Amino acid sequence: MKKLIIMLVSIFIVAGMSSPAQSSQVTAKKYSSCADMLKKYPNGVAKNIKARNKAVKSGLSAPKVSKKVYKKNNNRLDKNNNGIICGQKKAEPVAKAEPFAFAKNIDASLPADWVAEFNQVMSNLGQLMPISEKINEVSNVQSPMNIYAWNSAVSNPFPQIPGAQGASISGNGSSTWMVLEIPESELRDKDLHRFKVIAHEYFHVYQIAMSRDAEGTQWLWEGGAKVVEELYSQQFYGRSLFDEQLMPIHAAAVQTPKIFENYGSGKDMNYNGSAFLALALAKELQQQGMSEERAFTAILRDFQAESAQEPDWKKAFVNTFNMTVEQFYQSLRQYPTAESTQDWISHRVVDATPVVPSKTLTLNSIFS
């Protein structure tokens, strides 16, 4: 019996001795610095709920409530003596980039119906193909971009752009703007081009944004804009130059397409030749299995995006279309040339009928 009592006492003593060891496992840790503490408690520590709530009201992220941890570390780390250790300010929400905008400078020489349609076209285009935020990476383009528009019947009324004329995206190296000098004859004759040109120049801004203003090739740049111009006309006005097969198209478009890579060939009337090449590329992609919509998306959107990553346009071409530029040029041999039936055209021409897009093709389906 005595032996049993001794054993029980021994067990009690051992248990009592083990108790401090167990309690030490839950003892609050002493942190050497806030950096050390924040690894465990990323928002810091509050001594109680009241201190936590006060911290949140003051703009801090909600700290962990732990009286033990606070008591262990407050003498060194609670520098403000406010019941908070290593409090952290709430992260500022990431500011969302403002949509790219245009500043419209419309001269009074333009009639009210043109101004109304101009605003409608700009609204439609903004919904169909919004300007990518990538344009903020182009150093000489700022938002809002100025648009200067006037009737050619008057001299350029904007002294800030001396010498400006015609329709273009122009700049001085530090800033970029859009010029829309609308021919008086187009306004008088109700020529659709007075509206279509807006889509053409807008698309150039879209191209600049998607490609980060990468230098490319004229026929894809201007040809793409011409195609968008005519697709817009087809979709919103019910007719376009596709109905007339983009005539005239110089035979050089299929005989020596390389000359359309740069401006100044003298054989690209109204960019019809460049547009033909873009349409022929779309047809080639369809023959390889792409849908019509997907082929035009690849040309008008994807190639521009690839150009932002690969500045060599011929390499970007291969990456986007899975063929070389030379292979595409060889495919143009399938399109015959012929003498023009128009007396005022002295050169051979190409019939664009085989490459004209369908009437059901829309900008919505391409850019959605």
Regions found by a protein language model. Give the residues of each.
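Acidic/histidine-rich, surface-exposed loop or edge segments in extracytoplasmic proteins
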Residues: 95-112, 180
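Auxiliary, metal-adjacent structural segments of Zn-dependent hydrolase domains
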Residues: 28-36, 40-56, 114-177
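Calcium-binding acidic motifs and repeat modules
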Residues: 22-77, 87-94
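C-terminal segment of classical bacterial N-terminal signal peptides
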Residues: 14-23
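Acidic/His/Gly-enriched intrinsically disordered linker/tail segments
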Residues: 212-277, 283-290, 304-324, 328-363
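Zinc-dependent metallopeptidase catalytic helix centered on the HExxH motif
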Residues: 171-247
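Positively charged n-region of N-terminal signal peptides that target proteins for export
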Residues: 1-4
